Amino acid sequence: MPEVDRFGRLPWLWITVLVFVLDQLSKAFFQAELSMYQQIVVIPDLFSWTLAYNTGAAFSFLADSSGWQRWLFALIAIVVSAILVVWLKRLKKGETWLAIALALVLGGALGNLYDRMVLGHVVDFILVHWQNRWYFPAFNLADSAITVGAVMLALDMFRSKKSGEAAHG
């Protein structure tokens, strides 16, 4: 990776771009193929494709509000994204695990931010459920990238705290 010292770990932004592109392509595909709330069962009693629009935050938090939440969540995503870019830029060469985690979170945040700004809602299409009795809120690839990145960040902090020094690499 050229000029890592000058650009920190910014070369890892290719992961951010990949997450963003795959997220947007998958959302476009499911919007073209499914009608609202239509389900295509992939694994009976466990996993389906569906189409849902979320005007709130994760797990539809504040989805029933009057619309102000769109701008609040967009502002939060912009601020968090800027912080993540600065954090990525300041990482040292051996902090690969952390760079990947931050790039995943950033890609997911930007994917959902794009939806929120352009469409006014986030497009969700993955539905995990159990025998028509329990349904996890629908989500998308951006949400998945944010979750994986956040778990990686938590593991990184746990490993760092346990050993007493940064556990990157």
UniProtKB/Swiss-Prot annotation:
Active-site residues, record numbering mapped to chain: D124, D143
Localization, UniProt: Cell inner membrane
Catalysis: reaction(s): Release of signal peptides from bacterial membrane prolipoproteins. Hydrolyzes -Xaa-Yaa-Zaa-|-(S,diacylglyceryl)Cys-, in which Xaa is hydrophobic (preferably Leu), and Yaa (Ala or Ser) and Zaa (Gly or Ala) have small, neutral side chains
InterPro entries associated with the record: Peptidase_A8
Domain of life per record: Bacteria
Keyword annotations from UniProtKB, A to Z: Aspartyl protease, Cell inner membrane, Cell membrane, Hydrolase, Membrane, Protease, Transmembrane, Transmembrane helix
Ranges that cross the membrane: 10-30, 40-60, 68-88, 94-114, 135-155
Enzyme Commission identifier(s): 3.4.23.36
Membrane-topology annotation of the record: Multi-pass membrane protein
GO molecular function: aspartic-type endopeptidase activity
Single biological process term from Gene Ontology: proteolysis
Pathway(s) it belongs to: Protein modification; lipoprotein biosynthesis (signal peptide cleavage)
GO annotations of cellular component type: plasma membrane
NCBIfam families in UniProt: lspA
Protein function: This protein specifically catalyzes the removal of signal peptides from prolipoproteins.
HAMAP family: LspA (MF_00161)
Annotated family: Belongs to the peptidase A8 family.
UniProt name for this protein: Lipoprotein signal peptidase
